[in-house]
């Protein structure tokens, strides 16, 4: 069983664990995960090569996004932000299986944002 990993260069696991935020449409079919890596190894000065995507690799295979952007502070690369989008419930379920494996491999937990319950709170106020 292979360990779940994120790669910016194929075959090279990124050691920095990102902050990941999920958003989904109301019907749950589409959505996206935004990954933010602070000071990732992929942008270290000794790293040579262009970042052309972010690969999420686990025992089921790999998923890839080409939507990767650098964040700069005073002209120096400081972070990477990648967005992975899904267009079906099956794609979302596949992403969540990867996310669970990645969390387990890196000792991470899951927390739900308070903002996700805004409509429920509004309904309660009207009652």
Swiss-Prot record:
**Gene3D superfamilies of this UniProt entry?**
Photosystem II Psb28 (2.40.30.220)
Task: Point to the regions of Polar residues compositional bias.
Answer: 109-127
Q: Determine the domain of life of the protein's source.
A: Bacteria
Q: How does the record classify its membrane topology?
A: Peripheral membrane protein
Compartment(s) of residence: Cellular thylakoid membrane
Record's GO cellular component, any one? photosystem II oxygen evolving complex
| Signal peptide residue numbers | none
According to the record, the residues making up region (Disordered) are 108-127
**According to its UniProt record, which protein family does this protein belong to?**
Belongs to the Psb28 family.
Database matches in PANTHER family: PHOTOSYSTEM II REACTION CENTER PSB28 PROTEIN, CHLOROPLASTIC, PTHR34963
Q: Its quaternary structure?
A: Part of the photosystem II complex.
Specify the protein name. Photosystem II reaction center Psb28 protein
């Amino acid at each position: 069983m292979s360990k779940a990993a994120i790669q910016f260069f194929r075959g090279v696991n990124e050691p920095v664990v990102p902050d990941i935020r999920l958003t989904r449409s109301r019907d749950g079919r589409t959505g996206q995960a935004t990954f933010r890596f602070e000071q990732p190894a992929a942008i270290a000065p000794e790293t040579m090569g262009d970042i052309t995507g972010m690969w999420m690799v686990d025992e089921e295979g790999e998923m890839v996004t080409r939507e990767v952007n650098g964040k700069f502070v005073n002209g120096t690369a400081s972070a990477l932000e990648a967005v992975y989008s899904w267009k079906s419930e099956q794609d979302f379920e596949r992403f969540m299986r990867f996310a669970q494996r990645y969390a387990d491999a890196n000792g991470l937990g899951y927390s739900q944002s308070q903002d996700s319950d805004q409509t429920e709170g509004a309904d309660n106020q009207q009652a």
